């Protein structure tokens, strides 16, 4: 049984055992485009990926299932070499600890996502990046575009174009990298991991 057939079964919930780790060749392969119109199998896969993110952000479910919290997941991380990503970025509480008016700043399953335009300015997260497929800390600034325009198809097969900046931009670029065989630490300066080039925006 291949990975996708296993994962899309009605009884299956994605957990950490489904996520492959660095060293697996699928993480270094360029994934295939998803065919349109979308198959039921690919739609279900996307929905299962999104459900994993929801579960991973729920403290009770995450503890019960032994999940690491995540804001993004790409199909290649499940050993499925297809250009499918899910992103679920929660909005923070305000300064007084009140919940946000909108729960998520970005909530989408993207098929065949690609960066079609980007800023000259670059950005990096101040605390670096992590990855569900990497079981170690890799310190350093992961240099990416500060702003991007993304084209993708949603699960209804509609073509969408969105502009992203800040943390949302970083998350989507990280996941698209997975569909191109790129790991986040490939973008860290090997000689000086915390070097700051002119104009680099540090996102805290």
Swiss-Prot record:
Protein's GO biological process: co-translational protein modification; translation
Keywords noted in UniProt: Hydrolase, Iron, Metal-binding, Protein biosynthesis
Domain of life: Bacteria
The reaction(s) this protein catalyses: N-terminal N-formyl-L-methionyl-[peptide] + H2O = N-terminal L-methionyl-[peptide] + formate
Stretches that traverse the bilayer: none
Binding of Fe cation, residues: 131, 174, 178
HAMAP family per record: Pep_deformylase
Protein name in the entry: Peptide deformylase
Organism: Streptococcus thermophilus (strain ATCC BAA-250 / LMG 18311)
Gene this chain is encoded by: def
